[in-house]
């Protein structure tokens, strides 16, 4: 039997493995559209990243419940339009496979086409291959068949292709880096009243071809399993995971993997509004040749894994002793002029920006917990028009910043015009207070989906500014906490030195 999304056919035997309990979500970070594979005793997971760079985060685990961030497949997005923020564009729903000693990541950028990234070490540098210049393809997944053939399944974005809700299969070259035919439609959701069929993942198990894909849209959707004797179908269809009576809405896009001990699992996301798309782990059983996910087809709130616990966590705080931490992403392709690694400390140079929403040098990370405080210590060396601060990004966003002798709190709103037109952005002052000093500590507090801000000269003397405000989603993302130094007068300004970023999970 060929294991789904594994690096081999052998089962693993782990001596002394004890049952480990886990609770969903296993990750609070916005790891949207996850895919997962096993290679030997190691599990690897990737996710979407949209306009944030470096892109396609690569995570590693040995127990499926605890994950570490080990790198990114895309160091830059290879087009000049991503040298500035391109919200809702960029990296959509990648897939990951391991074949003949090589890791593969496939992704479609819906406006630019199909890419493959390859690496022998998933924590190292990845090589980018531009496979096909095409508009409107999304969510690609390869299948390296046991007879040497290579297939690709994908969906479509209606906003670009004029069609959606259907899945196509293409033949690929033996190395998986060339599409060699026009493809064939293998599933049309309209035939089964399935709307928004997307995110397909292709597998082969016991001679059968499988496509797992979500349908029904993101929040109220469900998981489909499609099964056929040929990659081209016809496919039988079954709903294998839905919300049921649980609080886990729309169990959406994800990946199927075996644990090497005879047990199958499904990792998927749940849309939690401003918190983004958090990661869940479901057991998979089998009945009449079909997968049954969760508990009788409904998501579980937690469970048991018979694997040794893996000590791992994703970093949040940073004193920049070793340079810029792995958790940070820019809002566009990074410019070397934006920052200097002081080791310790980080120098942010004031790049020109009309708004925080349009600032490529907004440096952010994913929220890793529901409630937390983020404290940042700045020493500013400002010129006219410079501001340095922290904020939480979304289509409605908030930030607190020091500039021109004042601490200011502002709200920004970005309104979509069209996919080719930059959003219309307005920023409105909420409150401000005089601050004649060059150094400041700023705090952002997140509680129950709301954010509030504080300022002062140290951790024990911080005062609130403004009230409590609801966080909102971004372009297919959750809200993102981050920091910045920018110039509002359209030119390069001075700089600020960031002494530390301390993120404390609320008890």
What is the predicted function of each stretch?
Residues 2-507:
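Carbohydrate-active catalytic/glycan-binding domains of CAZyme proteins
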């Amino acid at each position: 039997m060929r294991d789904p999304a594994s690096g081999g056919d052998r089962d693993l035997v782990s001596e002394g493995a004890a049952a480990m309990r886990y609770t969903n979500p296993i990750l609070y970070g916005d790891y949207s559209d996850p895919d997962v594979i096993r290679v030997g005793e190691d599990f690897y997971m990737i996710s979407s990243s949209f306009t944030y760079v470096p892109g396609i985060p690569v995570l590693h685990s040995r127990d499926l419940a605890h994950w570490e961030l080990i790198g990114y497949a895309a160091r830059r997005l290879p087009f000049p339009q991503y040298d500035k923020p391109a919200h809702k564009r960029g990296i959509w729903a990648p897939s990951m496979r391991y074949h003949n000693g090589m890791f593969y990541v496939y992704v479609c950028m819906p406006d630019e086409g199909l890419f493959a990234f390859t690496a022998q070490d998933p924590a190292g540098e990845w090589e980018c291959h531009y496979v096909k210049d095409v508009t409107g393809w999304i969510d690609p997944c390869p299948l390296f068949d046991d007879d040497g053939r290579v297939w690709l399944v994908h969906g479509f974005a209606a906003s670009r292709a004029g069609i959606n809700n259907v899945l196509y299969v293409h033949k690929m070259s033996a190395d998986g880096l060339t599409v060699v035919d026009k493809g064939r439609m293998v599933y049309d959701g309209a035939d089964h009243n399935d709307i928004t069929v997307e995110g397909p993942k292709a597998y082969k198990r016991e001679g059968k071809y499988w496509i797992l894909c979500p349908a029904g849209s993101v929040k109220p959707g469900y998981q489909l399993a499609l099964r056929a004797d040929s990659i081209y179908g016809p496919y039988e269809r079954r709903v294998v995971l839905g919300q049921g009576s649980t609080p886990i809405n729309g169990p959406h896009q994800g990946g199927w993997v075996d644990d090497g001990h005879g047990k199958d699992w499904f990792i998927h996301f749940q849309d939690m509004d401003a918190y983004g798309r958090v990661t869940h782990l479901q057991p998979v059983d089998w009945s009449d040749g079909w997968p049954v996910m969760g508990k009788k087809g409904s998501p579980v709130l937690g469970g048991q894994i018979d694997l040794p616990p893996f000590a791992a966590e994703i970093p949040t705080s940073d004193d920049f002793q070793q340079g810029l931490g792995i958790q940070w992403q820019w809002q566009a392709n990074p410019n070397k002029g934006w920052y200097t690694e002081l080791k310790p400390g980080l120098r942010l140079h004031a790049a020109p920006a009309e708004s925080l929403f349009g600032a490529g040098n907004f440096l952010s990370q994913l929220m890793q917990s529901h409630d937390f405080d983020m404290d940042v210590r700045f020493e500013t060396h400002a010129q006219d028009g410079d501001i340095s601060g922290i904020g939480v990004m979304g289509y409605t966003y908030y930030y607190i910043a020091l500039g021109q002798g004042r601490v200011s709190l502002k709200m920004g709103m970005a309104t979509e015009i069209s996919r080719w037109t930059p959003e219309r952005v307005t920023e409105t002052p909420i409150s401000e207070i005089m601050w004649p000093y060059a150094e400041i500590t700023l705090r952002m507090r997140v509680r129950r989906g709301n954010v509030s801000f504080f300022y002062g000269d140290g951790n024990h003397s911080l005062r609130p500014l403004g009230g409590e405000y609801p966080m909102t989603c971004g372009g297919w993302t959750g809200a993102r906490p981050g920091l910045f130094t920018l110039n509002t007068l359209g030119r390069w300004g001075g700089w600020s030195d960031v002494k530390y970023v301390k993120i404390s999970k609320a008890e």
